Amino acid sequence: GSREALADYSGPLAWYPAEVNTSTRKGWFHHDVEDSQVRSVDELFSIWKGSVGGNATFLLNVPPNRDGLLADADVEVLARLGEKIADFRSRRIEASREDEANVVTLRFDAPRTVGAIVLEEDIAQGQRIDEAVVTSCVEGTGEQEIARVHCVGYRRIVTLEKPVTATRIRVTVTASRQGFYLADVYAVRA
């Protein structure tokens, strides 16, 4: 929990992973009349980014029909969701990484248009980051704040409101508990 929530607590501490449960449909069970109401791939992708990219696991219910099979509408949206997630992952921008004290810098070989930043703590070391500021820069210009995050954990996907073109992305951890361990930091092409 937050430092404020823990201030007056003297018992043992435990970390529990967050979990997001939803269904491909508006309910948990299959009804033939709902085959045209399966959630869209864009809605499911948004839920995936918000859950997996929000330090949680994503449990997606796909209800079988009365024959024990998945409806074609569900299978189609799952295939398209898989393609969309694969596309997101394939847009990782190659960069060199420099770690120094509380700052991680990604340097690109040329200006790149960035649509998201992914931060991942080494959970084996604990969830420690309370706040981080993400800035971008094109060589020869000043730093520009593009995002501020509270809590990173397993994975934080920071989708930028507006893509930025940069030669460098910098993540500055401004508050943490006993240091921090960023297992991975990368930018995703817009």
Segments predicted by a language model, with ranges:
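Exposed beta-strand face motif in extracellular beta-rich ectodomains
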Residues: T167-I169
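Short beta-strand edge segments in extracellular beta-sheet folds
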Residues: A187-V188
